[in-house]
Amino acid sequence: MTPSSSGLEQSEIDAIQELEQTSRNDTLLKYHDICIDEGVIEQDVDMSCFSANSVGEWIVELIYQNNIKKLIMGATADSHYSEGMVHITPTKADYVIQHAPHCCNIWLVCNGNLIQTREGRFEHAGSAYSSSSSLHSIDSALIPYGGAGRAERVTEPHALSSSEEQSARGIEKMYYEEQRRRLEIEELKREKEQRDKMRRVREEALSSSSGVTKILYNEEVMRRREVEAELNRAKAEIEDMKRVQIELKEQHYADCRLLEKERDEAIKTTEELLRALEKGESSIPLQWSVSIEPPQCFICPISKDIMQNPHVAADGYTYEADEFRRWLNHGGEKSPMTNLRLENRNLIPNLVLRSAIKDWLQQHP
């Protein structure tokens, strides 16, 4: 079998040949087991597999090479057996009957029935062989489907012994098992042809304008879905950034208002002190005394010291940058002020507060 002659690819041909080889090996093993079950010494059982253009010619060649005296072979497949069948039709069996050596006894069986026999004839009287005993039991074991007198015999009909009958039935069963396997291989071939046909139809559909349009439409739908999903993720991130920005802006405004209030109070107190000094008052009212305590917004909530580098965290509060990073590095995942989980670890410099702290420190060395 070649790719050009069969229309199959080389890999498919190899697979079919491998399946056939496996089937042949299984059949030979069954033959081997039948021989062993019938008492044949295992060393006397020889299994061989040959490839030939003519099966009948090769069977005859094996008979001559191995000096075979008894041969049981299938006459035809079970599906070809008909009631009242008395003549063989396969070329293989007919060729063996005509060309096998005269000393070989041949029994042709089909579907459990004896179809034809050919007794061996011996030219030397000393080696004369009577097949009556070996053929006696086959008449009772392999009765033709249409009656006892249906089978054609070259000589007087006889029957196989019980063991030979079982062997014949086993060999016939294996022969038809081989046929079944061949049918399975043909079915696989038909299935492959059907798949190839469907593939060609599908390719033709895709090559048509409507098929191409449908494919392009589906691809466009998939791209739009991916873009929409990415856009939704980007919108969600922007909304989160806006929310954080609003919170930071509110905190910034609160700090500015506090600083303005403290500035106004400081200016007012300073003006009162100046007026008191100008009047020459020796004593200054207690409420005029300038507090040397820093404003609470200048104090880091973590270290309780005046901040040098204030930064706004994700919770909206201002911390000393180094102190807050140290807090995070030691496992702090929640806000020191709200005790809520921090959304991120980002810090934003609070430039206004840092400027105010710098001015205050210059006034209070």
UniProtKB/Swiss-Prot annotation:
Family matches, as InterPro entries: U-box_ubiquitin_ligases, Ubox_domain, Znf_RING/FYVE/PHD
Ranges of residues in domain U-box: 293-365
UniProt key word Metal-binding: no
GO annotation (BP), single: protein ubiquitination
Keywords: Coiled coil, Transferase, Ubl conjugation pathway
SMART domains tied to this protein: Ubox
One GO molecular-function entry: ubiquitin-protein transferase activity
Top-level taxon in the UniProt lineage: Eukaryota
Pathway(s) of this molecule: Protein modification; protein ubiquitination
Coiled-coil zones: 176-281
Reactions this protein catalyses: S-ubiquitinyl-[E2 ubiquitin-conjugating enzyme]-L-cysteine + [acceptor protein]-L-lysine = [E2 ubiquitin-conjugating enzyme]-L-cysteine + N(6)-ubiquitinyl-[acceptor protein]-L-lysine
Pfam family for this entry, one: U-box
EC number: 2.3.2.27
Gene3D superfamilies: Zinc/RING finger domain, C3HC4 (zinc finger)
Role of this protein: Functions as an E3 ubiquitin ligase.
Listed name of the protein: U-box domain-containing protein 56
Gene: PUB56
